Amino acid sequence: MMDDSILKYEDRMWQLTDATKTKMPELADAYYGSVKDAVYRDGSIDLKTKRLMSLAIAIQADCKDCMISQTSKALELGATTEEIFETCSVAISMGGTLAWSKALIVADYLREKELIE
């Protein structure tokens, strides 16, 4: 039986990301270097808000890895669970029940990190 821990999934996701970076170094350098550096920095919009915006987009795009990554990075930048759920509510307002079902991935992640009950 497969372990359904979202935190174990996150660890595996980062391991596979590192593995693919070594197989595609030029693309990885461009994408994880200059492209991300140009976007994910403080500017007119602060970095935490950009990560929350990215979370809403990840929910809409149905990208599980992106949802986990953006939630993790938003938390590292000081986002509260309230801010994360408010971000989810924006995504849900645009995407309906499909987005709601994807926001459950975020809730599961927060629960496993023991940030919510």
Regions found by a protein language model. Give the residues of each.
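Short, thiol/selenol-centered motifs that function as redox-active sites or metal-ligating centers
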Residues: 53, 57-69
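Short, solvent-exposed positions on alpha-helices
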Residues: 47, 65, 82-85
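Amphipathic alpha-helical segments within well-ordered protein domains
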Residues: 36, 54, 71-75, 89
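Alpha-helical scaffold segments that form or flank carboxylate-/histidine-based iron centers
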Residues: 16, 49-58, 87-93
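Acidic, glycine/proline-rich low-complexity segments that act as flexible tails and inter-domain linkers
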Residues: 1-49, 102-117
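C-terminal structural segments of small proteins and small subunits
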Residues: 85-109
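Iron-sulfur (Fe-S) cluster-binding segments and ferredoxin-like electron-carrier domains
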Residues: 29-30, 69-81
